Amino acid sequence: MAKLVNNETTQRAELHRKIWAIADNVRGAVDGWDFKQYILGILFYRFISENITEFFNAAEREAGDLTFNYADISDEEAEKDFRPYTVEDKGFFILPSQLFENVVKNAADNENLNTDLANIFKAIEGSAVGFASEDAIKGLFEDVDTTSNRLGGTVAEKINGYFKRNCRN
């Protein structure tokens, strides 16, 4: 039990450290409310990406594929094999290429990261259209304006800097 509490404390401290590092990186360029909405939206995106990956990985491992990693499969395979039942179970769907971990891997080379993120957020919200979760997912990322010039400099530079410095494991 003590080990679990210590691990949670360590994770919380790491999260606080990352949030302060992000704040230092964009301090002055964004007012507090916009900053909070942006960071919380990105953190939520990371959470649901990790959550859906673990959901698929656990199911595949239970079925006997101990080396399966959803993040490593093609979008086409995900569409065919996973999308049909996922929105019913999870309330949303994210393609492997749209997962936070894959976006981070490619952030340094992606000159369109800000618009790609906006499209990913729209796709996540759109994945619930026609399902019971539609109202809960609709507008979820509307406060995360990745094209806003309030982030200072160029948006792509700010977002790329955020991912490169603050989102690696």
Predicted regions and their residues:
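Non-catalytic, mostly N-terminal accessory regions of nucleic-acid modification and defense proteins
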Residues: 1-169
